[in-house]
UniProtKB/Swiss-Prot annotation:
Stated name of the protein: GTPase Obg
Subunit structure: Monomer.
InterPro entries: G_OBG, GTP-bd, GTP-bd_Obg/CgtA, GTP-bd_prot_GTP1/OBG_C_sf, GTP1-OBG_CS, GTP1_OBG_dom, GTP1_OBG_dom_sf, OBG_GTPase
Known cofactor(s): Mg(2+)
Enzyme class (EC, first level): hydrolase
A Gene Ontology cellular-component term: cytoplasm
Domain Obg residue range list: 1-156
Recorded family membership: Belongs to the TRAFAC class OBG-HflX-like GTPase superfamily. OBG GTPase family.
A GO BP annotation: ribosome biogenesis
Binding site for GTP: 163-170, 188-192, 209-212, 278-281, 315-317
NCBIfam families, A to Z: Obg_CgtA (TIGR02729), Obg_CgtA_exten (TIGR03595), PRK12297.1 (NF008955), PRK12299.1 (NF008956)
EC number in record: 3.6.5.-
Amino acid sequence: MRFVDYVSIEVVAGKGGDGIISFRREAHVDKGGPDGGDGGWGGSIYFVGDSGMNTLLPFYQTKKIFGYNGENGRPKRQTGANGKDIFIKVPLGTQVFLKKSLICDIILEKKYLIAKGGRGGLGNFHFRNSKNKAPRISENGELGQNFYLDLQLKVMADIGLVGKPNAGKSTLLSLISNSKPKIANYEFTTLVPQLGVVKIYENSFVTADLPGLIQGASSGKGMGIIFLKHIERCRAIVHVIDFGSDNKNPIKDFIEIKSELEKFNKKLLDLNQIVIANKCDLPNFQFNLANFKRKFPKIKIIKSSLISAKQNEINIIKEKMFGLLGENQKKLEIQEINTSKIEFNLKAPFLIKSRNNGFFEITGELIQKIIQKIPLNSQENILRFNAKVKKIGLWDELIKKGIKPGDLVRIYEFEFHWN
């Protein structure tokens, strides 16, 4: 399956159902009164973390997600049915961004609210009072939340394998896990992160094989800048370094890799790290190993020839790697964020655009919310709408801008002549 770790999508939660104007009409029931029911809630959109997924490919093919609308109210005070909520599976490690701000970090196998459905409108039964016993007032359902989102996947792995291209990372992953990455004797065989579950006794952990890093990866060279983000969630790092091949300098390789990790995220250097010194069967190995130990005496090193490793060597490597994940191992900070607090941003109540030909166009989130919520289908609803817009100062502002009787005013889809 194609690996996709970044997509842009639009989510539109369901609109709430409209409340209705209705009066009880039954034989032998005089003056039955208002009985218009409320609209149902619009369906919300949730993301659900799924450990079985490892790509955002489904979102690459589906750019828009729409929620189900709530049903309109009915006579006899019957509330319309709520719109069905939508639950969409996403890979664990998916981050959701709204206007470049992180609003949701999906790190657990549970549901996360992404877009909330609109509230259902009230029927005329709710507007009865001692002064108005037969109100012809109702409300439309509110629109569901509508967001343009960026999704970014950072794989959820306990240990990240890093190293220069063709150092043996894919070979190691194939030996210690059930993963079957592509292995070949040329650089950049691994083009996307590969995950494998490593079992050791009654325990297990997830290891990620990241594409080979080169000097300058943190600033965009090679493929490193694309995939370095995937190591940010790891709890430990294993360096796989070629100690035996000709023209290889393990000290230089190790310094360059650590430098790229530090430039990308300094916290990565705080993680437990070990080095797997690969290709111990080649002539240059002992010389390079001795120099490396003198330069980095405190670094833990595991000697191996991965291509011909025996099972007991593989078990030792697995034990050493598992040992990096002790209970006291400090994890990188992962903040779980939920979008339930996201609301529409009502910065300005309205914006007036005027033209020389006596035309005024009114826009703005608050005025849009008012015109959308109050249906202009009765005299009482029109009076209620008039009171709402007068309260926010729209009429006064139009007068200041020189509106004259007969001028045309447009508020989204609603037009009228000023009187």
